[in-house]
Regions:
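Intrinsic low-complexity, intrinsically disordered terminal tails and linker regions enriched
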Residues: 1-40, 44-327
Length: 327
């Protein structure tokens, strides 16, 4: 897996072909969910990518449509991609236990709504929108799902589905605001694609396995996402081992007994899959980013030690004060 992913990263994603644009930075974290096989969470920074809130939404939508799709390819025109999408990119209509982890019908929000075109839905404004507007929106969207379910075997397109409940695309966009509590990208999607996960055609053809590619609207959520995966599952274990070490010291155990106690605690509280065990034993990287940091031990104190942010701020404040005095 590690070899395949790195070749995919280097020879496809970072290649001159630029399947999702020119990548200027990246971060990834390998995860082993439920003691199973590895999968990778990645973030890519694309050169000159439009930023939400700084440009018109239409520019962002054009960017999204260029690189992201949830279309089921025509079997006659592109059988290879069609077969891959149908084999690895269809969410189960029965849903799995993982879907219901957070007490919802599907935490991945499948089925996804059909739409004639991609748009960015921004939450409704309580100061401008009434409760009656919200109730009407929820009623119409509920009717939409009923119609989709009733005619799922008839291969109708979005316009035909909308027509059956007297709904226009712009009205759908307006009503959709009432069921979202954050900025959301709604992709262009036909009724037969409501269980299709989004993908990039070039990446999917090369990787030949499930992916979930998204444009980031919320930078803060993105930062939280990065931090959570950098330290995922390791913080709790670290606290446990520290507690075990403290207990050993309080019991006046020698070094050998302390190591044995810590090792036993690790083995009894850390469940790992065979794949993760191999990753760790062989020294394969669980996370990596494009920005490399190398510590060079120079100066009077060559110890490698992180400096707290508050100390750095004090140093900066001290330097600023000295500059003012010298002026």
């Amino acid at each position: 897996f590690d070899n395949r992913f790195h070749k995919f990263l280097k020879n496809v994603i970072m290649s001159e072909a630029q399947p999702i644009g020119k990548i200027i930075d990246y971060f990834y974290r390998v995860e082993f969910q439920q003691r199973g096989s590895p999968h990778t969470h990645c973030l890519f920074w694309v050169e000159n990518a439009p930023k939400f809130g700084e440009v018109e939404n239409d520019e962002i939508i054009t960017f999204i449509d260029k690189y992201i799709s949830c279309e089921i390819p025509d079997e006659k025109e592109d059988k290879e991609l069609h077969d891959i999408v149908m084999a690895v990119h269809q969410h189960s209509k029965k849903h799995s236990k993982s879907c219901k982890k957070k007490g919802t019908v599907c935490r991945f929000n499948f089925p996804r709504p059909p739409s004639n075109r991609t748009f960015i839905s921004e939450p409704s404004d309580p100061d401008k929108d009434s409760e009656d507007d919200e109730e009407l929106a929820k009623e119409i969207l509920s009717d939409l799902w009923e119609v989709i379910k009733k005619h799922e075997d008839e291969n109708l397109d979005v316009s035909e589905i909308f027509k059956k409940i007297g709904l226009a695309q712009e009205n759908f966009r307006t009503y959709y605001r009432f069921i979202t509590n954050r900025n959301t990208v709604v992709l262009k999607r036909q009724p037969n694609e409501i269980y299709t996960n989004q993908y990039n055609p070039h990446l999917l053809r090369a990787w030949d396995a499930n992916m979930d590619i998204q444009y980031i609207l919320d930078a803060f959520s993105c930062v939280v996402y990065i931090i959570s995966y950098i330290s995922k599952a390791e913080r709790e274990l670290g606290l446990l081992l520290q507690q075990t070490k403290n207990e050993a010291e309080e019991g006046n155990l020698n070094a050998q007994q302390t190591m044995k106690k810590v090792g036993t605690s690790y083995l009894h509280h850390r469940e790992i899959s065979a794949q993760e065990a191999v990753f760790r034993v062989t020294g394969l990287r669980l996370r990596e980013c494009s920005r490399k940091v190398e510590f060079i031990p120079v100066g009077e104190n060559p110890c490698r030690m992180s400096v707290p942010l508050k100390d750095l701020e004090k140093q900066q404040s001290y330097k600023s004060s000295n500059r003012k005095r010298s002026n």
